[in-house]
Amino acid sequence: MNVAEITAKAEVLLEALPYVQDFRGSIFVVKYGGSFMDDPDPAGRTRVARDLAFLAAVGINVVVVHGGGKAITRAMESSGLKANFVNGMRQTDEATIAVVKKTLDEVVNRDVCDAIGGAGGKPKGMPGDSVLVCQKLTTDDNGNPVDLGYVGDVTEVKVKLIKKEIADGFIPVISPVAEGYDGKPYNVNADLVAGRVASALRARRLVYMSDVPGLLANPADPESLISTVKVGQIDDLKKKGIIDKGMRPKVQSAMRALQEGVQRVHFIDGRLAHSLLLEIFTDKGIGTEFVQ
């Protein structure tokens, strides 16, 4: 390595310094999802885990909410159950919720925790229904009546339990399952869970990691990334089709989180090496940030 390369590395560290100083002690909620979670090559998951461990090492209080839809589908197939979807939402009967909870808590959550632990972090797996309360979902996104079975909408986050783990030096890793008013587990949308958790914890940042670079003005052109979106622009972007159906739950959650005190929400590509660090600790960033 020559002097120029060494100096360039030092410049990267110096660019990160003011962000590290500013964010120390802040809460960041990271929604960990996307196809890279299912990639047979563990390199992508390892990179993300190292980024999460790095955030914790520099004094940022990280809370992780993970998805796991593909793992659930595989587990259902192995159990002889058929996955049915209504407007993108999984119908969940008693047999299905048992598979959902077992897969999320005992397989996906454990895998995420193992990856973070392997990177030097201190993860603490938290079954979602130990910290999330929900009501049964009775309408779809358009307000039409719908019965999806054991599918809920989070109404309460048990902040004290999560903050206790943070105070004890852990990275809470929460699965998207909530306890219903009837005491039974319910399947809940992980994107919406991340937003509710961020709002309840008064998080400084909410970061969504998925399979796209962020919000694209032209979905066919990865170079058309929109770096910053203000809440007031969102309706227009929906009308133009820039915010499509697949992105709407994330954007809806981002809007609500911003309205409830989260300072910024970021959409980044989890497949890109160290995208989390590049978004948080560089001046330009690498994804799309949503602001008030």
From Swiss-Prot:
Binding site for substrate: G68, G69, R90, N187
Any one annotated GO CC term: cytoplasm
Keywords: Amino-acid biosynthesis, Arginine biosynthesis, ATP-binding, Cytoplasm, Kinase, Nucleotide-binding, Transferase
Main location: cytoplasm
Keyword Transferase on entry: yes
Record's subcellular location: Cytoplasm
Site (Transition state stabilizer): K31, K250
Enzyme class: transferase
Secreted found in the keyword field: no
Annotated EC: 2.7.2.8
GO annotation terms (biological process): arginine biosynthetic process via ornithine; L-arginine biosynthetic process
Molecular function via GO: acetylglutamate kinase activity; ATP binding
Pathway where it operates: Amino-acid biosynthesis; L-arginine biosynthesis; N(2)-acetyl-L-ornithine from L-glutamate: step 2/4
Pfam families per the UniProt record, alphabetical: AA_kinase (PF00696)
Catalytic activity annotation: N-acetyl-L-glutamate + ATP = N-acetyl-L-glutamyl 5-phosphate + ADP
Protein family membership: Belongs to the acetylglutamate kinase family. ArgB subfamily.
Database matches in PANTHER family: N-ACETYLGLUTAMATE SYNTHASE, N-ACETYLGLUTAMATE SYNTHASE, MITOCHONDRIAL
Task performed by this protein: Catalyzes the ATP-dependent phosphorylation of N-acetyl-L-glutamate.
Protein name, per record: Acetylglutamate kinase
Protein encoded by which gene: argB
